[in-house]
Amino acid sequence: MAFLTALILVSIVTAAHGQTVVSIPLGHNYTLIGPPITSEVIWTKLGSVDYFDIICNKTKPIIVTCNIQNLTLINVSKVYSGYYYGYDRYSSQYRNYLVRVTQSKTTKMPNMAEIRSDDNSLETFTSSTTPDEKNIPDSMIAIIAAVAVVMALPVICMLLYACRYKKFHPKKQDLLLRLNI
């Protein structure tokens, strides 16, 4: 049980550590920089059909160009969202990216009369600086998830132990194990 707890904790910390979050507007190209190389970087997209899908040799559903180190995503669409992992075959160097595809927002240019009236209203308006509550860092979410898992596992272990103890030792009565399960 301790091994399972350690495995879950290590996987959560590993997923949160070293990951670069990239937001790319629809229709743009973007280059993911690979790790320092000794031979050639292999790029995979996690969560695709083959789970670890080597993407430099494929043409569908995403179109990319690969050189020895970097991966360029071409004409980005929603299909490109996901985790990209680039690693050097002969060393332990790797880079981890979380790609998020965003809608590009277009706005109309205001005329000069609107700008002047906005300048006057800005002089009278004072705002307090508050942090953006909708933007929670991924590392904080990973830490909270790890704490919740670590707190839940001992409770689950105690319940399982109590059930198994009662099943195999029905004649022994312990005050702590008087569960009606």
From Swiss-Prot:
Keywords: Early protein, Glycoprotein. The keyword Transferase does not apply. InterPro entries: Adeno_E3_CR1 (IPR003471), Adeno_E3_CR2 (IPR003470). Pfam families: Adeno_E3_CR1, Adeno_E3_CR2. Glycans are attached at N29, N57, N70, N75. The keyword Ribonucleoprotein does not apply. Belongs to the adenoviridae E3_20 family. E3 proteins seem to be dispensable for virus growth in tissue culture cells. They are potentially important for virus growth under special conditions; E3 region may help adenoviruses to evade the immune surveillance of the host. This is Early E3 20.3 kDa glycoprotein. It comes from Human adenovirus B serotype 11 (strain BC34) (HAdV-11).
